[in-house]
């Protein structure tokens, strides 16, 4: 329930900013007045939600796991930080809003928008022409920019950072578009192709931005800069020199190993980690080291018995009957090291040093 309220709060403040701070004119084809905002509000809310869900997926096994408070931290000016996690959150939120608006446009949810057929009939490359129904990312980009960027009314370095990362998110959607083609020719031959652009799965956008997160650029500017024309010029010059495909941040990240109630950080104590599994990636297999060991915590193995339906059979007519199977599941958690473990480790290190001397 909390998340839904936060998402609709996000959509509300986007619309409020649109009504109070920005002229609502997009290529002279949008309606004006409250009805115009309501048309897109559900898509904005859904897009913000998809951004949050993707953020939580991408950071599920990181020390920072995109907590529910991330949206609040992003939209409340008094609480916002300017680290690389904030950069990712702005980008994925912006991407989510643009992606959803674009998809809903193609689905026919808006009267003033449809397929992008502006290049249809033009030669795209060797043996293929533009055609079909391309997803209208241009529409999604323009509308999402009007909504999302309206949140940043300041002219300081942090506002510039957020606007930059919003743009990175929109570029990510455009950059991951996929070309789909259909063959034309006699008897199934492919003498020529008609091609169009489609949105990828949103997971592709998330994966793309997670890579950008790892390579985010730190900008050395004072957060309070922007009180004079000279400082605003310096900020603009700095950000204009950085590619709109690279995430930027102003601050180093806090220590996510430790609990910090002021920042709403729970720390990693009590977190579940992964050790074994056929389908685990290398990153996932290292979670116990990353979340526990590297944070000075021990790994505790816990076993629990679960009950689930199994051996299901269809019986005529028309029921499915299942057995209830019990299974022991092993899970791993980060816990504080006991004094005994600490003393044992200290003794081993001392013994090792003595052996080296001899």
UniProtKB/Swiss-Prot annotation:
The gene is wnt8b. Glycans are attached at residues 104, 260, 279, 345. Keywords: Developmental protein, Disulfide bond, Extracellular matrix, Glycoprotein, Lipoprotein, Secreted, Signal, Wnt signaling pathway. This is Protein Wnt-8b. One of its GO terms (biological process) is commissural neuron axon guidance. A lipid is attached at residue 187 (O-palmitoleoyl serine). CDD domains: Wnt_Wnt8b (cd19352). Belongs to the Wnt family. It comes from Danio rerio (Zebrafish).
């Amino acid at each position: 329930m909390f998340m839904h309220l936060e998402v609709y709060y996000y959509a509300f403040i986007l619309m409020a900013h649109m009504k109070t701070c920005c002229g609502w004119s997009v290529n002279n084809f949008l309606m004006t007045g409250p009805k115009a905002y309501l048309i897109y509000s559900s898509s904005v809310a859904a897009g913000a939600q998809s951004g949050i869900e993707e953020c939580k997926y991408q950071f599920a096994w990181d020390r920072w796991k995109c907590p529910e408070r991330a949206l609040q931290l992003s939209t409340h000016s008094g609480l916002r930080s300017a680290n690389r996690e904030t950069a990712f959150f702005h980008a994925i939120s912006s991407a989510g809003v643009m992606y959803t608006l674009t998809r809903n446009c193609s689905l026919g949810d808006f009267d003033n928008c449809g397929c992008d057929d502006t290049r249809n009939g033009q030669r795209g490359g060797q043996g293929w022409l533009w055609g079909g129904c391309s997803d209208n990312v241009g529409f999604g980009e323009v509308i999402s920019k009007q909504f999302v960027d309206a949140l940043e009314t300041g002219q300081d370095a942090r506002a510039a950072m957020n606007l930059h990362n919003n743009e990175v998110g929109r570029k990510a959607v455009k950059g991951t578009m996929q070309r789909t083609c259909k063959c034309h020719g006699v008897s199934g031959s492919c003498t020529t192709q008609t091609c169009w652009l489609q949105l990828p799965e949103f997971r592709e956008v998330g994966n793309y931005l997670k890579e950008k997160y790892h390579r985010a650029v730190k900008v050395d500017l004072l957060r309070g800069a922007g009180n004079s024309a000279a400082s605003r010029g310096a900020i603009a010059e700095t950000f204009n020199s950085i590619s709109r495909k690279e995430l930027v941040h102003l601050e180093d990240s806090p220590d996510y190993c430790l609990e910090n109630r002021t920042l709403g950080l729970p720390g990693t104590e009590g977190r579940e980690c992964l050790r074994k599994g056929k389908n685990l990636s290398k990153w996932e297999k290292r979670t116990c080291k990353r979340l526990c060991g590297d944070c000075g915590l021990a790994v505790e193995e816990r076993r629990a018995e679960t009950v689930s339906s199994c051996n299901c059979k269809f019986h005529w007519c028309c029921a499915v009957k299942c057995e209830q199977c019990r299974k022991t599941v092993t899970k791993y958690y980060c816990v504080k090291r006991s004094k005994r473990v600490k003393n044992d480790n200290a003794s081993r290190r001392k013994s090792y040093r003595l052996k080296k001397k001899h």
